[in-house]
A protein has these predicted regions:
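Long, positively charged binding patches that form subdomain-scale interaction surfaces
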Residues: 155-270
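Residues at beta-strand starts and edge strands
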Residues: 56, 226-228, 279-281
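OB-fold/S1-family single-stranded nucleic acid-binding modules
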Residues: 288-311
Length: 311
């Protein structure tokens, strides 16, 4: 993992420079040896400076009650946390680029999202998880690496002090991804553990306060999705903004939201110009309900299908 390698080399270089400064002026042989080692480290660092990490590499270090120094971690804790982290990564990977993640059941091609434990890392105790499926060097960042970036961002947003960042993230989370994040922090919180996450150029530590904050947010929040049919009057469609308004026959309330990708721009123009508005339709809507800490649930709607009814 490039960041860990660079950090380790930088630490060795700093230690070596300190030794060189402390050497007696007449210790010529010692100085030659240390300078040769220093030059080699600088060369290694220079080679890594321009390197780009395109595959998924994640290091998870643990502290707190389940960990015995840098010697070991409780087996049940380690198994559960690594398992839920992999589950979270697989679900984020399954929803990349707007792909549909089913509400339940297996994730398509899930095996392609699996990481491998390649190394036990020390400095507390942890694991290095790496993408190993394709041994040829990719030209671009792999989808699994993109998913790892998102996972790290979600974890940081749940545990961070910025409420606005958390609020923005939960507004877009798939319910299964949300549940996986809740499970991950649930095991960390229950185990009275702390952790450090290294992914890409991100290196972030999560103390007991951060874990408690993330767990409280996950417990007090919820994300639910369902498809519903609504019969009512189409009040209007704004093609440029892809927005709609529909008055429900049953409740009399006006439902507004986003028009789904199924509806092309030409079709939306027809709806807005050919007196489709005011007519009765049977609409299939995607309803998303988000519950946040200390707030009333909010509903968001996406129009999926329209079926014209006899007027």
């Amino acid at each position: 993992m490039l960041k860990i390698e660079r950090d380790q080399l930088a630490a060795q270089l700093a230690s070596l420079n300190h030794l060189l400064q402390s050497l007696p002026a007449n210790d010529y042989l010692g100085r030659l040896g240390f300078e040769a080692r220093r030059d080699a480290l600088q060369q290694q660092l220079g080679a890594l400076a321009g390197a780009e990490e395109r595959r998924a590499h994640i290091a998870l270090y643990f502290g707190g009650d389940p960990v015995v120094g840098s010697v070991g971690v409780q087996a049940a804790f380690g198994t559960n946390v690594i398992g839920t982290f992999q589950d979270l990564l697989s679900k984020v990977w399954g929803a990349l680029d707007g792909a549909t993640l089913p509400q339940m059941g297996p994730i398509k091609d899930k095996e392609a999202s699996q990481l491998h434990i390649t190394t036990i890392v020390h400095g507390s105790f942890g694991f290095l998880l790496e993408e190993l499926e394709d041994q040829t060097e990719p030209m671009f960042q792999t989808p699994l690496s993109q998913a790892a970036d998102q996972v790290a961002n979600y974890i940081a947003s749940f545990a961070g002090e910025n409420d606005a960042s958390f609020s923005q993230i939960i507004d877009i989370l798939n319910p299964r991804v949300f549940q996986a994040i809740r499970d991950f922090f649930g095991y960390i919180h229950k185990g009275k553990a702390t952790f450090r996450l290294v992914e890409g150029e991100r290196d972030q530590e999560f103390d007991h306060l951060a874990v408690e904050r993330a767990w409280n947010r996950a417990e007090a929040s919820n994300v639910a999705e369902e498809r519903i049919h609504v019969v009512g009057r189409l009040l209007g469609v704004i093609p440029m903004k892809r927005r709609f308004e529909l008055e429900s026959d049953e409740t009399g309330t006006v439902i507004e939201g986003r028009v789904g990708e199924k509806f092309g721009s030409t079709y939306l123009e027809r709806i807005s110009t050919q007196q489709f508005a005011g007519k009765r339709w049977r609409a299939l809507l995607h309803k998303r309900t988000v519950t946040k800490v200390g707030r009333e649930p909010t509903d968001n709607y996406t129009l999926l299908e329209l079926e014209e009814l006899p007027q």
